[in-house]
UniProtKB/Swiss-Prot annotation:
Keywords: Amino-acid biosynthesis, Aromatic amino acid biosynthesis, FAD, Flavoprotein, FMN, Lyase, NADP. This is Chorismate synthase. Its EC number is 4.2.3.5. Gene3D superfamilies: Chorismate synthase AroC (3.60.150.10). FMN binds at R126, A127, S128, G287, K302, P303, T304, A305, T306, R328. NADP(+) binds at R49. The gene is aroC.
């Protein structure tokens, strides 16, 4: 845990591998036994993340076929560590020869060198987005646990590319709408404009950033552990650990700072099935604990750092120079970031679901009686 390659408390994932190494993968420890699981379950998510899926993503061609090496027997999980492997097949280390001695601006090259005194400069090594294969594979397992155990649905989509913003209702958006176009934006008009923007940036050897929005529906009440493991804090850490992420907000986010308390508060009301809130500016979390409403969050992603435009930089021996990077890179990370965000949200919710049941649901203790307190005057 101290080296930053593992994530989670009870549902713990450890990813490994580099961009141009032999393979990448993940070990998942803490998955409950008897979960139906196949390579097809995982492959469906990896196919959404893989490179080369459209003309607005990196042209690197990787099938990203997964192998389950342990932890599953006759189609069911054993409760033991699950090892998932994906072999790299289309590595071109020669495209990165300049990076052996030259730092890419705004990439991890310089900081990895400063920290470790050595780095794998082929495609970014551990800092490459190929590391997220392990996250998405583990997220596929977490998604299945959440769906079967609690009916939780997690859906992300591209909400903005540069200045093109989609008009989307998180409460009603569907997976079919998201997957209807290559940019994964459920607003068709905005999607067309986004694609044009990305195509133009790619022609110029440049890149664009934007925002991915994610909604988690049917999340049980009670997930989250005050005070340092609040649900939104763990969600923020999870998505902010993704490559190129630069910002996080949940519910009303920064826009909520323009409101008064009266305007911002989510008032309660009763339904036959229990209490609900009339609005959802809290984004489904209050006091660090899920309240049963949709969890709605947004993640900002910067423009891809590796571009073909000439940029000023320095070398390992301290010489100033100019670099126009080669290699194959996404002109915009947003379309492929969608399954990555879903995976990280799933990992957090699955971990907290297991933690909640371990602390609050595992023992048959008596309910605390409701005190007889007079209602306040309206």
């Amino acid at each position: 845990m101290a080296n930053g390659n593992s994530f989670g408390v009870l549902f713990c994932v450890t990813t490994y591998g580099e961009s141009h190494g032999g393979a990448v993968g993940v070990v998942v420890d803490g998955c409950p036994p008897r979960l139906p699981l196949s390579e097809a379950d995982i492959q469906a998510e990896l196919d959404r993340r893989r490179p080369g899926q459209s003309h607005i993503t990196t042209p690197r061609q990787e099938a990203d076929r997964c192998q389950i090496l342990s932890g599953v027997f006759q189609g069911f999980t054993l409760g033991t560590p699950i090892h998932i492997l994906v072999r790299n097949q289309d590595a071109r280390p020669q495209d990165y020869s300049e990076m052996a001695t030259t730092f890419r601006p705004s990439h991890a090259d310089a900081t990895y060198q400063a920290k470790y005194g050595i780095r794998n400069w082929q495609g970014g090594g551990r800092a490459s987005a190929r590391e997220t294969i392990g996250r998405v594979a583990a997220g596929a397992i977490a998604k299945k646990i959440l769906r079967l155990a609690a009916g939780v649905e997690i859906l992300a989509y591209v909400q903005r590319v540069q200045d093109v913003e989609a008009q989307v209702d998180p409460s009603s958006v569907t997976a079919e709408q998201v997957e209807a176009n290559i940019v994964r934006c459920p607003d068709p008009a905005a999607a067309a404009a986004m694609i044009e923007k990305i195509e133009a940036a790619a022609r110029e050897g440049d890149s664009l950033g934007g925002v991915v929005e994610c909604v988690a529906r049917n999340v049980p009440r009670g997930l989250g552990c005050p005070v340092f493991d609040k649900l939104e804090a763990d969600l923020a850490k999870a998505v902010m650990s993704l490559p190129a992420s630069k910002g996080f907000e949940i519910g009303s986010g920064f826009a909520g700072t323009y409101l008064t308390g009266k305007q911002h508060n989510d008032e309660f009301y009763m339904t036959p099935s229990g209490w609900r809130t009339r609005s959802n500016r809290s984004g489904g979390i209050q006091g660090g604990i899920s309240n049963g409403e949709d969890i709605v969050l947004r993640v900002a992603f910067k423009p891809t750092a590796t571009i073909r435009q000439p940029q000023s930089t320095v070398t390992l021996d301290g010489q100033e120079t100019v670099l126009a990077a080669r290699g194959r890179h996404d002109p915009c990370v947003l379309p492929r970031a969608v399954p990555m965000v879903e995976a990280m949200v799933a990992l957090v919710l699955c971990d907290h679901l297991l933690r909640h049941h371990a602390q609050c649901r595992s023992l048959a203790l008596p309910e605390v009686p409701i005190p007889a307190v007079p209602l306040p005057h309206s």
